[in-house]
Structures are given as C-alpha cells and as structure tokens.
Swiss-Prot record:
This is Peptidase T. Its EC number is 3.4.11.4. It comes from Streptococcus agalactiae serotype Ia (strain ATCC 27591 / A909 / CDC SS700). Zn(2+) 1 binds at residues 82, 142, 199. Cleaves the N-terminal amino acid of tripeptides. It is found in: Cytoplasm. One of its GO terms (molecular function) is zinc ion binding. Signal peptide: none annotated.
Length: 406
C-alpha cells in the first residue's frame, strides 16, 4: 500500500542532525536528539492521536500509546526505533530521490558514485524509488526509516478506527549507534507483552539472533630509552600492542568472517614508545564460544605479563550485550506472528542472525522479547546508504498486519 505522508515524513526526519556522541556522559548524548524528540516527534504523535505521549529524561525515550480498538486482541505490542545516527557526517543531509532504472547513480556533485559494480544489492531495486545521499553525508535511514514507518502506521490506524487492533506502544530512543541506548530502558513504563525494533535492512528481514558482545581495552606500558643505547633496556609499548594483536587468530576478523562466525575487531590503536592503547570489540553467537574468545584475550595478556615479569599489559574487558535468541526462543509468538503476516503479504521472511546488535538485545533480557523487523536501509552508516520507498511502504504494511493478529 502507498502512504501519502511516508516519504515527506522520512525526508523531514533525515535532514535533522541527530548524530550521537560516544564521548558524552549525558543521556541522550546529544541535545539534538532531545530536540528531535520534543519539537518534531512528540507534537506529531499527539496530532495523529496517540495517547499518554511522554518523554522520559531519565533514559531519553519518547513513548506513546494507541489504545486498542478490539477486546478480542489480547496482546499489547510495542514498536521501537532509534533517533540517533551513526558516526559519520550528518550535517546538512541533502537526500536525492531517484527513480531507479539500473546503472550508476551520481551522488550529487561529490564525485562519488553508487554503482551496482560495487554494491550488487542495487540490482534488487530496478523500477523502485530510491532515496540516496548526495555523497557528503550518510542518509540516516538507520533508523529514521523505522521511525517514519512506525509513525505512518500509527497515523493510518488512528484515522481508520474501524480497523481492529491491539493496544500499541511506540518508543523512540537515543544512542543506539553507540551501544548504550537501551541501558536505561524502562520496561515498567513501556508495559507490553512483546515488541519489535524496526531497525533492520532489506525487505523481509526478521531477526531474533544477535551477537553476544564484549569490549576490550588494553593499555601497554613501555619504557622509553634513547634508541642508540636501548639494547636490553627499552620496552616499546607500540611493539607490545603489535605482539598482542599478532597472537589473535588472524582469520577471525570481521573482513574474513560471516554467518555464525565470531571475530576480534581492532578498531583503534594509538600511542608512543612509552604507552600505547588498543581497543577491540569481541563478537560471537554461542555462549561457550563467546566465553572462549574473552578468555583467550585475557590469557594472551597474562602470558605477556609473565614473560615481561611485570604488569605491562593492562586489561579492561566488559560485556556489552547478549544474544537475544536465549530469551526469544522460549516463546516464538512474536516471530510466528511477523512471519505469518509477511507471508500473507507475499514477502519472503529472511530469518538470519544479525551480525551486530539492536536495542532489542538488551530489552529482551530486561523482560520484553524484542526481535527486529526490516526497515529498508542498505549500505548503512556511510555516504552510500540508500533506502527504497517501496520497501518502507511494505514495512508499514507489516506493522499494520502484526497489530491485527491475535
């Protein structure tokens, strides 16, 4: 089904810079997310007929309710999307609307080309309306497509009171892209039987498995001596960082893994001879493999310290989130409902693990099973991001179908 305001709504949202800040200790981490919630989304939610619309300063979530129109439908269902965008330029986003007929797409005057040679997924969108960047920013379909889809579905239901649906809660939250958005999620306030994050990618994605995730921060303490007289005296902290990295399995990196394979990812390295720091993320699906990965990192550091006869490798290892499969597989109702709706709409469900995490990973372990639905974005987190309007429309269709199921 086509929805009159869906594209307009999406374009309005993405033009607002809501990039999160990993270095901030505030909640949300940027004022722009607060402003987006209070000056754009909250008035719109109230205007379309949502009730009890309220912003929670304690966690940065904007929440509203669409009351049920049927006593027959017993479930209370939530839909959640995040307001922030990823760590890429989000200032002066200028979307392009392209009626795609194949071939390359010039991204404004940036000199960048969105080409099916580099991104074969473009070949899935011949004849569709694509929204792209101008090559200078990301787009923000992750996850403003999800927000636009949820809002459009709620507006449709509010304007069609004859449609039977269950009680619906809507939540728009902050800071998902930096992994802390759901840390303070208020389960009691949201009060649903189960929920969905609308934060997935291509048409049909339906996901209830995520990585289990840990962060690893290492500090290497060296001893700087003039290199001309350094023999048996200098300890080069940068070399220690390299030595640590070389002991990790070289084929277990993001660029060499897929499907259910885990990895170690070195994403930051800095320092001098005197001190160096490296930061990793550790990811795996099965609990036993996740524990083994963390233990290997600790063992390497311990062995290096033993060889150096002092604690020159300092380890900070902490869990970030866990595979929500452990929660959701206890009751597959939200998966079964979404799958049934997709099949009724002639959408093929793509049930695959997320090689990442969602807010649903944490929310599921807080007590609300929260799998992930497609929102349409492709090539997310950069200048080559795009989304199909037709896929967004189908996401709205799926939301409408879910809330009408018993």
């Amino acid at each position: 089904m086509s929805y009159e305001k869906l594209l307009e709504r999406f374009l309005t949202y993405v033009k607002i810079n809501t990039r999160s800040n990993p270095n901030s200790t505030q909640t949300p981490t940027t004022q722009s997310q607060v402003d987006f919630a209070l000056t754009v989304l909250k008035p719109e939610m109230e205007a379309i007929g949502l009730k009890d619309v309220h912003y929670l300063p304690s966690n940065g979530y904007l929440v509203g309710t669409l009351p049920a129109t049927s006593d027959r439908l017993r479930h209370k269902i939530g839909f959640i999307s995040h307001m922030d965008t990823a760590d890429f330029n989000a200032e002066n986003i200028t979307p392009q609307i392209v009626d795609y007929k194949g071939g390359d797409i010039e991204l404004g005057d940036s000199g960048y080309i969105l080409s099916p040679k580099d991104f074969p997924n473009l070949n899935n969108y011949h004849g569709q309306t694509l929204i792209t960047t101008d090559g200078k920013t990301l787009l923000g379909a992750d996850d403003k497509s999800g927000i636009a889809e949820i809002m459009t579905a709620m507006e449709y239901l509010a304007s069609h009171p004859e449609i039977e649906h269950c009680e619906i809660r809507v939540g728009f939250g902050p800071d998902e892209e930096i992994g802390i958005g759901a840390d303070k999620f208020d389960v009691k306030d949201f009060d649903v039987d189960f929920a969905y994050t609308v934060d997935g990618g291509p048409l049909g994605e339906l996901q209830y498995e995520t990585f289990s995730a840990a962060g690893l921060e290492l500090t290497f303490e060296g001893r700087n001596v003039h290199p001309g007289t350094a023999k048996n005296q200098m300890i080069n902290a940068l070399q220690l960082a390299m030595d640590f990295h070389s002991q990790l399995p070289e084929n277990e990196r993001p660029e060499q893994t897929d499907d259910y394979q885990g990895f170690y990812h070195l994403y930051d390295l800095s320092g001098t001879v005197d001190q160096a720091k490296s930061s990793y993320i550790i990811r795996d699906f099965e609990e036993v493999d996740f524990l083994k990965r963390k233990q290997l990192a600790q063992d390497i550091a311990d062995n290096m310290n033993e060889a150096l006869q002092s604690e020159r490798v300092k380890v900070k290892l902490y869990d970030q989130y866990y595979n929500m499969k452990k929660v959701i597989e206890k009751d597959m109702t939200p998966i079964n409902i979404a799958k049934e709706v997709m099949e009724e709409l002639d959408i093929k469900p793509i049930i695959e693990p997320i090689r990442g995490g969602t807010d649903g990973s944490k929310i599921s372990f807080m007590g609300i099973p929260t799998p992930n639905l497609f929102a349409g974005g492709e090539n997310m987190h950069g200048r080559f991001e795009f989304v199909s309007l037709q896929t967004m429309e189908k996401a709205v269709d799926v939301i409408l179908g879910i809330v009408a199921k018993d």
